Amino acid sequence: MTARQDDQANEGYQHRSVLLDAAVDYLVTDENGRYVDATFGRGGHSRLILGKLGQGGQLLGIDKDPEAIAVARELASGDSRFQWYHGSFAELDLALERQGWSQVDGVLMDLGVSSPQLDDASRGFSFMRDGPLDMRMNPQQEPSAAQWLAEADEREIADVIWRYGEERFSRRIARLVVERRQEQPIETTRQLAELVAEAVPKKEKHKHPATRAFQAIRIFINRELEDLEAGLAAAVDRLAPGGRLVVISFHSLEDRLVKRFMRDLARGPKLPKGIPVTAEQEESGFQLIGKASKANEQEITENVRARSAVMRVLERKAN
């Protein structure tokens, strides 16, 4: 899953997963291991993982988007090593229990909204294409962005746009939303984008004024940060010795959460001062692998949306 809200105008782009080769190279350490692509999308990472696995290897693809699962079904029909689970990676424990897997050798998370989702106007993620104001990764869940904006009070709207979009003009946007919805329902992406552009001064040359507001509403509607916290915790609990968690994030809120989570695990447990402990008790069971990685110039040239991608890798130490 590669495309992100900060740039949605690249019409000629053909979907290709960001940091594709690097992520899979870090992830696959055993060709006969068990792996999870926790954000299957359109299968870019999964296909490359399967290409690196031997006949004894297994891969589980997870996604909450029914359109992604349709692609996963097709892949599973042609490769017995691949299985799929329809749901959020926050449900990783349940997904693995259904597979009968107690541990895995690696989990890959490629966060945010995918290029196909952004490029499909009917999904309502993009302010560059007019469509219904939906923004749900799983259309079966409630509410849609339009429903929420119709019902939420001004304070809640402002808080969401500030918390998840870090938008300085969140209160001004919220006030205008409440005013305009009394005149007519805000039901399309164009309506919302024009409203936000009216409320927010256009200071950043290459960024649409609605970027932060759209990001914030999408994150809130899909519970992205809550799911991320749950998914990270479940992933490390299920890692076998030597297993790796590879996470690609696309905005600072995600990356700060991932960075803090991995750093704290690698540092080891916080133990009370003055209490005798063994070296084993002080040592962390995890280690960071390399430094944070970013897309190279070629990837950014091929897909300008890759410019904000950051990849981090955590490994459970072998016994």
From Swiss-Prot:
Residue numbers binding S-adenosyl-L-methionine: G43, G44, H45, D63, F89, D110, Q117
InterPro entries the record matches: RsmH, SAM-dep_MeTrfase_MraW_recog, SAM-dependent_MTases_sf
Similarity remark: Belongs to the methyltransferase superfamily. RsmH family.
Biological role stated in the UniProt entry: Specifically methylates the N4 position of cytidine in position 1402 (C1402) of 16S rRNA.
Gene3D superfamilies referenced in this protein's UniProt entry, alphabetically: Putative methyltransferase TM0872, insert domain (1.10.150.170), Vaccinia Virus protein VP39 (3.40.50.150)
GO annotations of cellular component type: cytoplasm
Protein name in the entry: Ribosomal RNA small subunit methyltransferase H
